[in-house]
Each structure stands twice: as C-alpha cells, then as structure tokens.
C-alpha cells in the first residue's frame, strides 16, 4: 500500500480508502466486517462513512469492528452530514456518530452547504466540537472555490477552526477539481479525498 502525508493530521494515510456507503444496505453486517478486515490486512487505514449511510447502520458496523479488533487508534475516520445544518442537528448527529462508532473522537467530520443556515453559524458549532476534541479536524463536502474562500474569511475573522479536509468528486471523467480546487487546497493545507473515483462503476466497464 502507498501512503500520503495528510498535512492536516500529520499522519500517513493510505492512498486507497474504504468507502462504507453500502454497509448494512447492499452488504450485510458480517460481510462488512470481513471486508474491513481485508482492507486493514492490505494496509488501508482510512474509512469513509456518513451519519446518514444506511440510516446509521454503516457507522454502527464500524463501531462493532473497532470493539472487536481494538484498532481504533490505527484508523482514520471520515464522517459527515448533509441537509439540515442547524446547531441542534449538528450537535445531535456528532454525538450519535461518536456513540455509534464507539469512539471519543472522529478524525474528520464534514458538512455540506445548507442554504437555510448562515455559514458562520455552521462554522461556529463545528469549531466548538473541534476545540472540545470530539472531532480532530473540521471538513467540508462538495465546496467550490468560492465557498472555501468565504469560509476562510469567516474562520479567520472569528478565530474558528479552519478546514482540514475537502471531500469532492474526482475521477477521469469528472476532473473539475483540477481547475482551482487542488491548487487552492494545497496552498491552504487542506487535504483532499475523492468520492466515486470509479464513477460508480461506469469507468470500469461494468455497465455496457
């Protein structure tokens, strides 16, 4: 396995991460646990999940895996929420994610865009959780360059925690991140992970 140095955590992270969106949905709990085992045996140390994946079952499966294997400290967890990003919802989701995954912290916790909530309110509550140590770094999902810059202005003005990670779509068919995002994030020490690197299977020739 090849590894990259994630500046935002100062950790070596496997270049291949394991997405857990199908856990508890297309893949049973037992098969998910076996898949996690194989991933770790092959050097993968990044698991990417979400509060909403399989109505929370994905995070619960990770929690069961960590309890069985006693290897939480060896794994970097990425989780996230979308939709309603009110203070009440963010607090509820982060607390439940911690309980589900049987951990006292989540390495990266991401937010998307909620047009109904002021961005400064979202960044303020995420900053609180980072400073409390319940999340190690604040992350964002599908932010474009203008949203990243707007966030930076708010974060610097209020001394809020800055983003440590951007999760965005990037593969050989969708290469928009190459225009500005990659360079900007490199300058701002924001690490990047891509989702749908195989285009949900279309790039592999699965669908004809």
What residue spans do the PLM features occupy?
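Beta/alpha (TIM)-barrel catalytic core signal, keyed to glycine-rich beta->alpha loops juxtaposed to Asp/Glu
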Residues: 114-208
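A short, structured active-site edge motif that brings together acidic residues
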Residues: 73-84, 108-112, 166-169
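Conserved residues at the C-terminal ends of beta-strands
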Residues: 19, 50-53, 109-112, 141, ...
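Active-site mouth loops of central-metabolism enzymes
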Residues: 19-30, 80-89, 111-117
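Short, well-ordered coil/turn segments that N-cap beta-strands
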Residues: 11-16, 43-46, 71-75, 103-107, ...
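Short, acidic/polar
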Residues: 27-40, 85-102, 119-124, 145-153
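N-terminal binding-site loop/beta-alpha segment at the start of enzyme catalytic domains
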Residues: 1-75, 131
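Conserved, mostly hydrophobic/aromatic
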Residues: 6, 18, 32, 39, ...
């Amino acid at each position: 396995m090849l590894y990259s140095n994630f500046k935002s955590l100062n950790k070596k992270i496997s270049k291949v991460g394991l997405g857990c969106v199908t856990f508890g949905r297309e893949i049973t709990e037992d098969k998910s646990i076996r898949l996690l085992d194989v991933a770790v045996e092959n050097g993968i140390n990044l698991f990417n999940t979400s509060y909403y994946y399989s109505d929370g079952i994905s995070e619960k499966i990770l929690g069961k895996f960590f309890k069985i294997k006693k290897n939480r400290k060896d794994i970097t967890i990425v989780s996230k929420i979308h939709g309603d990003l009110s203070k009440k919802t963010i607090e509820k989701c982060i607390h439940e994610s911690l309980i589900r995954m049987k951990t006292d912290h989540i390495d990266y916790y991401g937010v998307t865009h909620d047009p109904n909530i002021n961005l400064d309110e979202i960044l303020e509550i995420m900053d609180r959780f980072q400073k409390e140590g319940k999340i190690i770094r604040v992350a964002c999902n599908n932010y474009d360059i203008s949203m990243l810059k707007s966030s930076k202005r708010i974060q610097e003005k209020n001394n809020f925690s800055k983003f440590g990670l951007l999760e965005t779509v990037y593969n050989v068919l969708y290469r928009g991140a190459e225009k500005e995002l990659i360079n900007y994030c490199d300058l701002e020490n924001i690490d990047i992970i891509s989702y749908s690197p195989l285009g949900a299977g279309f790039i592999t020739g699965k669908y004809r």
